[in-house]
Curated annotation (Swiss-Prot):
Positions of the SPOR domain: 184-266
Region (Disordered): 1-21, 71-136
Protein name from the UniProt record: Cell division protein FtsN
UniProt cross-references to SUPFAM superfamilies, sorted A to Z: Sporulation related repeat
Species per Swiss-Prot/TrEMBL record: Caulobacter vibrioides (strain NA1000 / CB15N) (Caulobacter crescentus)
Length: 266
């Protein structure tokens, strides 16, 4: 520990010179002015807050303060003219048009045609006319009997004239019915696929039904059935062929699609 009686200019000794914080300072300790000022300021703020709070908030037994002026009691409803009017009322911004039904492209009903009847071969029938009946002989008289007695002389034999035998009438050749020629099948490049069926019978049925739905557009068109193996299952892809243009095939597809059938143009 340092010697308190050593001065600043005292020559050093063998004793170590060190600072001891526990060594008392000479004279009286100064007052903590900063702490005192902080306490005074804090007390002042607390007093100010308490006074402001008590002045702005009513007591527990005080009635609430009235805000604004009192409203008189309304005995009758206000007139419509006194109510504010919306300047945009009555304006029609959008047109309330009734929705029009969309056009449905359905095939017209098919007109049944008369089945062609083959003409039957008729053989001409020969008719023979009966000979004319001989007139009845008049009653004999005396003069006629005398004339007959005088005429009972052998008359000369008549000369027999050979008459030509009538030629047999040749029978008219029987007319045979000619089968109607099948309508020519169009061979256009475009086609419409109408489905992939599980059997040839269903494929033929689907083709016939598609042609029936649009007979005018499918007139003279062909049928094409392709065998396709898909995932171990054999399908029969059916198409209506022979359309001259892609537009004609598209029109046929739209006509049968309007009846609920699926198709696409190839």
């Amino acid at each position: 520990m340092s010697d308190p009686h050593r001065g600043a200019y005292t020559p050093p000794t063998d004793a170590p010179l060190s600072f001891d914080a526990r060594q008392p300072v000479r004279g009286a300790r100064p007052l903590p002015m900063t702490l005192i000022i902080s306490a005074v300021v804090l007390v002042t703020l607390v007093v100010a807050v308490v006074m402001i709070y008590r002045d702005g908030v009513r007591g527990p037994n005080d009635a609430p303060q009235a805000v604004g002026t009192e409203v008189a009691q309304m005995k009758t409803p206000p007139a419509e003219s006194s109510q504010p009017k919306d300047p945009a009322s009555g304006l029609q911004i959008y047109h309330n048009e009734e929705p029009q039904p969309s056009a449905t492209f359905a095939a017209p009903p098919e007109t049944p045609l008369a089945r062609p009847v083959a003409p039957t071969a008729t053989t001409p029938v020969e008719t023979a006319s009966l000979p004319a009946a001989k007139p009845a002989a008049p009653a004999p008289t005396i003069e006629s009997l005398a004339t007959a007695a005088a005429a009972q002389k052998p008359a000369p034999k008549p000369v027999q004239v050979a008459q030509a035998a009538p030629k047999p009438v040749a029978a008219a050749p029987a007319t045979t019915a000619t089968a109607p020629k099948p309508a020519a099948v169009s061979t256009g490049p475009a086609s419409v696929q109408i489905g992939a069926l599980s059997s040839p019978a269903l494929a033929d049925k689907a083709w016939a039904e598609a042609v029936r739905l649009a007979p005018g557009l499918a007139a003279g068109k062909g049928k094409k059935v392709e065998t396709v193996d898909k995932n171990g299952t054999t399908l029969y892809r059916t198409s209506v062929t022979g359309f001259a243009t892609r537009e004609a095939a598209k029109a046929f597809c739209e006509a049968i699609a309007a009846s609920g059938k699926s198709c696409f143009v190839k």
